[in-house]
Amino acid sequence: MALNLRKNHPLMKIVNDSLIDLPTPSNISAWWNFGSLLGICLITQIVTGLLLAMHYTADTSLAFASVAHTCRNVQFGWLIRNLHANGASFFFICIYLHIGRGLYYGSYLNKETWNVGIILLLTLMATAFVGYVLPWGQMSFWGATVITNLFSAIPYIGQTLVEWAWGGFSVDNPTLTRFFALHFLLPFVIAGLTLVHLTFLHETGSNNPLGIPSDCDKIPFHPYYTIKDILGFALMLSSLVALALFSPNLLGDPENFTPANPLATPPHIKPEWYFLFAYAILRSIPNKLGGVLALAASILVLFLMPLLHTSKQRSMTFRPLSQILFWVLVANLLILTWIGSQPVEQPFIIIGQLASLSYFTIILVLFPIAGVLENKLLKL
């Protein structure tokens, strides 16, 4: 009898065990589609990014013009750029929904998978930040200046660290060059971390909406979930193309159509929408080091989720108190996102401070209390 190549070839069997014969819970919902959507986002960004890099010049005197040249003179250059810029937004939409799913259904109890996922989020944020600097518009330059300057809040070594990162005494040509190098490198780091993420996931298998073991009821990934994923791909890619073709600048900042000028500060310096919640938390503390620590904590607090889980049930499916808190947290993050886009004046300052406080309170205090309370109410 001939050997089945799919199951025996050293490379094909890895693909087979990850995408074809993978035993998968039979009841996972569309919330489990975002992992594969993130994979498609990464592939799209690497392909469009590579095509853009072929026409880009990492030099302060040429960067802005080279991006304009790509849009005007390169075949479909405008489309490639718009897909790449808006693809980043879709990447963040998918990752935030993916993390939200993990929080709701208790997926963070797969500790290794969860921790690698947070490192992936941090790497993605770094990639998006250095990428935003490359067109060398006003918001690129001032965004880079403001965010890199935050490192100067680190006691004793801060200023040295910032000048080392800049490669000089301000954001200038060396900064742009190294940011381009990092922006080219980091997506491949993300791809590598994704494989680690999947390796840990396949050690335990996927969680499911009920939060109970599903070993007794597994189905093969192909064809059931391959076809379901393809539907997700079609919906996401058609949305991305629609955004890139009909309103490519909807999510961008008009300030970035002006070439970078170190002598003129834009009236409102703000990052892209996907960083606004963290930016609002940073601004809500009237102390530089305190703000930087709060900014870091806003993401790093995710590492504590497995430790803060007090419920005897894994998922929130049958936990109404935690569900209410979860959706309050979502609303809270939307408020922070809105506040991050507003000028620093009343009433936005106090709203931002209250939203920042409630963000940490819900995660660190109220979720664990709700878990204990639900155990008592449900007599578990």
From Swiss-Prot:
Question: Can you tell me where the transmembrane regions are?
Answer: 34-54, 78-99, 114-134, 179-199, 227-247, 289-309, 321-341, 348-368
Alphabetically list the UniProt keywords: Electron transport, Heme, Iron, Membrane, Metal-binding, Mitochondrion, Mitochondrion inner membrane, Respiratory chain, Transmembrane, Transmembrane helix, Transport, Ubiquinone
CDD domains with a match to the protein in the record = cytochrome_b_C, Cytochrome_b_N
| Bound cofactor: record note | Binds 2 heme b groups non-covalently.
Coiled-coil positions are none
Which Pfam families does the record associate with it? Cytochrom_B_C, Cytochrome_B
Locations listed in the record: Mitochondrion inner membrane
Required cofactors, per record? heme b
Q: Where, by residue number, does a ubiquinone bind?
A: 202
Q: Might you name a Gene Ontology BP term for this protein?
A: mitochondrial electron transport, ubiquinol to cytochrome c
Binding, heme b b562: 84, 183
Residues bound to heme b b566 are 98, 197
**Which membrane topology describes this protein?**
Multi-pass membrane protein
Q: From the Swiss-Prot or TrEMBL record, what is one GO molecular function term?
A: ubiquinol-cytochrome-c reductase activity
Gene3D superfamilies, from UniProt?
Cytochrome Bc1 Complex, Chain C (1.20.810.10)
Q: Name one GO cellular component term.
A: mitochondrial inner membrane
**Further comment found in the protein's record:** Heme 1 (or BL or b562) is low-potential and absorbs at about 562 nm, and heme 2 (or BH or b566) is high-potential and absorbs at about 566 nm.
Entry's family note: Belongs to the cytochrome b family.
Subunit comment for this entry?
The cytochrome bc1 complex contains 11 subunits: 3 respiratory subunits (MT-CYB, CYC1 and UQCRFS1), 2 core proteins (UQCRC1 and UQCRC2) and 6 low-molecular weight proteins (UQCRH/QCR6, UQCRB/QCR7, UQCRQ/QCR8, UQCR10/QCR9, UQCR11/QCR10 and a cleavage product of UQCRFS1). This cytochrome bc1 complex then forms a dimer.
Physiological role: Component of the ubiquinol-cytochrome c reductase complex (complex III or cytochrome b-c1 complex) that is part of the mitochondrial respiratory chain. The b-c1 complex mediates electron transfer from ubiquinol to cytochrome c. Contributes to the generation of a proton gradient across the mitochondrial membrane that is then used for ATP synthesis.
Q: Which protein, by its recorded name, is this? A: Cytochrome b
Q: Which organism is it from?
A: Vireo latimeri (Puerto rican vireo)
